[in-house]
Amino acid sequence: MTQLFRKIINDPVYGFITIRHPFIFQLINHPAFQRLRRISQLGLSHLVYPGAIHNRFQHALGAMHLMQNAIDELRVRGVEITKAEEEGLLAAILLHDIGHGPYSHALEHSIVGGVHHEDISAGLMDQMNRDLNGGLQLAIDIFNNQYHKPLS
């Protein structure tokens, strides 16, 4: 009997989010991803709107949850998505903003001119891919729009 992997995270927007893949849970626990807990999704908005305290960690988990919903719906509609593709899609969306720095877009070009957060995201994903023995390659290909699903 195959034992299912399931971790549940209580999200302030979507409620309970289920993590179905050990590799995705490993990504969430990676120090590069955990740093997103300290990076504001809404920049300096909290100075005007005290309730604007959403962080990049919460945003990434919510985006991953919505991607999981989209994958499930596509499968219901007959679209074949392999387990590897599912993990790659979830990892790519989970890490899409990993390159953001303090206060997100508000300081993006002030700290290092001419460098976009997408470039930093790609560099961090490459480093994480090395840390994870190539386990992120499909996600990186998806992130860089280099993955093309083979036709059946």
Which sequence ranges carry the predicted segments?
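Sequence-structural signature of the catalytic-core scaffold of metal-dependent phosphohydrolases
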Residues: 1-39, 47-90, 99, 103-152
